[in-house]
Amino acid sequence: MAATTLTHTQVVSGWAAHDSSGKIVPYTFKRRENGANDVTIKILYCGICHSDLHVAKNDWGTTVYPVVPGHEITGIVTVVGSNVTNFKIGDRVGVGCMAASCLECEFCKQSQENYCKNIQLTYNGIFWDGSITYGGYSKLHVADYRFVVHVPESLPMDRAAPLLCAGVTMFCPLKDNNLVGHPGKRIGIIGMGGLGHLGVKFGKAFGHHVTVISTSPSKQKEAKERLGADEFILSTDAHQMQAKKRSIDFILDTVSANHSLGPYLELLKVNGTLVLVGAPDKPIDFLCFPLISGKRTVKGSVIGSMEETQEMLNICAKFNILCDIETITPDKINVAFDRLAKNDVKYRFVIDMAGNPTSSP
């Protein structure tokens, strides 16, 4: 996609971090005018992803301040560009992690634009015209229609918001490994947070035997009785880990804390696969023997394409897969950040841009 000079004249109210303290405060900024390929969205809800906290605090050393986080956006279309035919005013829509891609490389042409080397991020990115992208902690968003999805009518807009990142992050590895539409496998989910709890829901909806693997014994009841997991393995219990060696076909590792993969690899059957979707900030540690002795595979996966995101939302509507959330008002973002840092949420905070805080189970 060629660089274009854009006019940024729309004054928008939002919430931003201005330094590495990560404190979020009200912030007024400008967005571009709605272009021929754009839709303007009145934001209703925006999920809080753990990466929002990392970026706000510059934990990864890439933050450009002031930063307006948020890439789990749901809202209503209010303006439609002249080239846009698949959205209309009043449509329920969502925006995830991507603002744009080149649309010309091999990955973009294969509907895998999430692997485009020139991907433009929804926030804390540099857009084609050199401007900084601002995310969904705001009242209004302007997006290229090619990076917008329809939110099915049956999905509540608040509980659908985290699906734009967490949902597609968990769905795509299952699809890529032939686990959608082919039931009967044994799946393991490492970690039962915002990502992991959705992994359990997807796995069960797709007809698999699901095992939650966690360091927290307190999560066993929640995993089995409320989320419907078939088994629970306490990973700090050597006897439980030993008893379950070579018992799982496929593992999704959602954990971003530093941890060794070795013990988890041994849970896999011969030819089993472990996919990383968490992002530890230090090199991953594992001995090669569990890998080579079981002909096992370790892979990575990041979000999903726009086509996959729409497919995922449609499947969530079909199976009634929803994120478990706690809604907050914008003035409580810093409280939510503090709690998120302590893993004190079940399982995702969602900001209600209109106010009216409630909690959803």
Regions found by a protein language model. Give the residues of each.
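Adenosine-nucleotide cofactor-binding segment
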Residues: 183-192, 200-263
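Glycine-rich beta-strand-centered segment in the early N-terminal region that forms part
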Residues: 30-46, 59-109, 150-154, 214
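Glycine-rich Rossmann-fold phosphate-binding loop(s) that bind the pyrophosphate
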Residues: 166, 191-195, 279
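Helix-to-beta-strand junctions that scaffold the AdoMet/dcAdoMet cofactor pocket
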Residues: 268-269
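Short N-terminal strand-loop motif that marks the start
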Residues: 1-74, 139-145, 354-361
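C-terminal hydrophobic helical "lid"/dimerization subdomain
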Residues: 1-10, 212, 217, 306-361
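Rossmann-fold NAD(P)-binding glycine/threonine-rich loop
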Residues: 278-295, 306-314
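NAD(P)H dinucleotide-binding glycine-rich loop of Rossmann-like/cofactor-binding domains
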Residues: 102-190
